[in-house]
Regions:
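N-terminal nicking endonuclease/strand-transfer module with a His-rich metal-binding environment
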Residues: 1-250
């Protein structure tokens, strides 16, 4: 299903690469089931309000639509298992992967190599890759601070249409492979509770930027963790408020 190795170097991925980030950031890959709005968000068919201007274009490579892949998986599952796939099954998953900079050519090449490695080692099949260079925040001086990242969409099933069974060890190995292929420092092992989705990461960058300007130095590892913990706590608190409000409205 994955047929992107032959992408011409002069095609859509051949973009000018300005405003490179020189600060080394740690790798992070966060994998979750796709949602109903994943494809529209990733392709920018529905543009979020928080996008910021970028001199480097996004990359969108789609081998197949999510809906079509799911239909193929469901058909294969019925043929091999003899019954319909459960509605709560998550055969298609999506990774949000932090990128070190906005070098589209290099990042795309590394992402494709990572996809090949994941397919060979675990049977994970990527069928969409989206590189986003237009998210981040504008600081107090009007300068753009970008959150470069990619969304990769996977067929997370075996040749019988059954979901792949990967445990903590395999998921940790995927974190390591991501760091190696993207040529980034690996995120700390066991720090899953401090990982942020890309929306939370945007807020983290904004807070981090302001504090470093106030302190006139880079934040320590301890200070960095404290920011992440606070963001996660606030996110959980907001979710709880939403749940309580919905109960009251009933």
């Amino acid at each position: 299903m994955w047929a992107l190795r032959g992408l011409p170097r002069g095609g859509r991925a051949d973009c000018s690469c300005k405003n490179k980030i020189l600060i080394m950031i740690k790798s992070c890959i966060k994998i979750k089931p796709v949602t109903g709005g994943s494809e529209n968000h990733n392709t920018r068919e529905v543009k979020p309000k928080y996008l910021i201007p970028s001199e480097v274009e996004n990359i969108h490579i789609v081998d197949a639509k999510i809906e079509d892949v799911r239909k193929e998986i469901e058909k294969k599952y019925i043929e091999n298992v003899g019954q319909k796939m459960q509605a709560k099954a998550t055969p298609i998953r999506e990774a949000v992967i932090l990128l070190p900079d906005n070098d589209n050519d290099k990042n795309l090449e590394n992402l494709l190599a990572l996809n090949d490695a994941l397919k060979e080692k675990y049977g994970i099949q990527a069928f969409q890759v989206h590189i986003h260079n237009d998210e981040g925040h504008i600081d107090d001086e009007g300068k753009a601070k970008y959150n470069y990242h990619a969304h990769v969409v996977y067929n997370w099933t075996d040749d019988k249409g059954k979901s792949l069974k990967l445990g903590k060890e395999e998921m940790s190995e995927i974190q390591t492979l991501t760091a190696e292929y993207l040529e980034m420092e690996r995120g700390e092992k066991g720090s899953k509770s401090l990982s942020l989705n890309h929306h939370e990461y945007r807020g983290y960058l904004e807070i981090k930027d302001k504090l470093e300007k106030e302190l006139k130095q880079e934040l320590s590892e301890k200070q960095d963790k404290e920011i992440r913990i606070k963001i996660i706590e606030n996110e959980r608190e907001n979710k709880n408020i939403g749940r309580n409000t919905s109960r009251i409205s009933r």
